[in-house]
């Protein structure tokens, strides 16, 4: 018997009491998209009339989390060149009542104004260092916060397969378009060379599935000698493909950010252990 778990990601705009109740009853996890401070969120997440959505969605999210009890959720933001001080956004979300927080770097072509580049790395590193101190202060004062990217199991960790191939695209999950087309994940939608089949036609290309199963830390040359390979597990296949043209070629900017996050995650855990 297969066990299916469902997760939903929402931008919060159309949440009603009925939808909140349905999500909380049926979804194993829920991801709430919000970028942090009002001015940060509303710069990138605008409604059709050009106005921001912060005021509308934050109240919906608070209601959902309050009703959800101890079931899994997290608020998920994206930081860009516009908010390289993203530790402030993490703290803003925590102070707004959300104790499960994730922020991810935007992945965009360097020609785009808000894209993150190598020149931004020093500031990004400093923000992660700052978050280590901020989270420690919260815990020292009796508070609780889980910052998604500082969660690491130093005793056992994931199973061997997950250590070798952290990205489950094409094997553990797929993306299905409204037309029934099947892709390894949502970021591959539109890249026809990676269309795995179609539900309506009853087709499925197992060769693509096998290709993604073979994308692991030993198939990626830059991963083989990296100290973080068994925690990063090869990174995002979509980023590797979009920026390097090959799912077996790790995207170096992502690698550098990931290594810094792992360093901070280890430091944060060591601090907790020494208390």
Cite the ranges covered by each PLM segment.
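C-terminal accessory region of radical SAM enzymes
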Residues: 123-156, 186-233
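Radical SAM enzyme core and accessory elements
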Residues: 179, 218-275
């Amino acid at each position: 018997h297969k066990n299916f778990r469902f997760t939903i990601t929402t931008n919060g705009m159309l949440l009603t009491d009925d939808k909140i109740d349905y999500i909380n009853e049926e979804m194993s996890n829920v991801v709430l998209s919000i970028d942090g401070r009002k001015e940060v969120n509303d710069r990138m997440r605008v409604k059709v009339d050009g106005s921001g959505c912060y005021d509308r969605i934050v109240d919906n999210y608070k209601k959902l989390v309050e009703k959800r009890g101890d079931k899994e959720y997290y608020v998920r933001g994206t930081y860009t060149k516009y908010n390289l001080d993203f530790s402030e956004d993490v703290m803003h979300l925590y102070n707004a009542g959300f104790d499960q927080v994730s922020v991810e770097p935007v992945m965009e072509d360097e020609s785009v104004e808000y894209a993150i580049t190598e020149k931004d790395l020093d500031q990004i590193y400093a923000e992660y260092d700052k978050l280590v101190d901020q989270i420690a202060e919260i815990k020292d004062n009796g508070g609780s916060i889980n910052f998604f990217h500082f969660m690491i199991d130093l005793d056992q960790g994931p199973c061997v397969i997950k250590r070798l191939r952290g990205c489950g695209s094409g094997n553990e999950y797929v993306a299905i378009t409204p037309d029934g087309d099947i892709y390894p994940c949502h970021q591959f939608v539109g890249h026809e060379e990676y269309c795995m089949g179609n539900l309506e036609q009853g087709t499925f290309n197992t060769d693509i599935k096998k290709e993604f199963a073979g994308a692991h830390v030993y198939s990626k040359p830059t991963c083989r000698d990296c100290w973080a390979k068994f925690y990063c597990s090869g990174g995002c296949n979509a980023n590797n493909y979009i920026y390097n043209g090959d799912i077996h070629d790790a995207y170096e900017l992502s690698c550098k950010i990931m290594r810094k996050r792992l360093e901070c995650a280890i430091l944060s855990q060591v601090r907790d252990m020494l208390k």
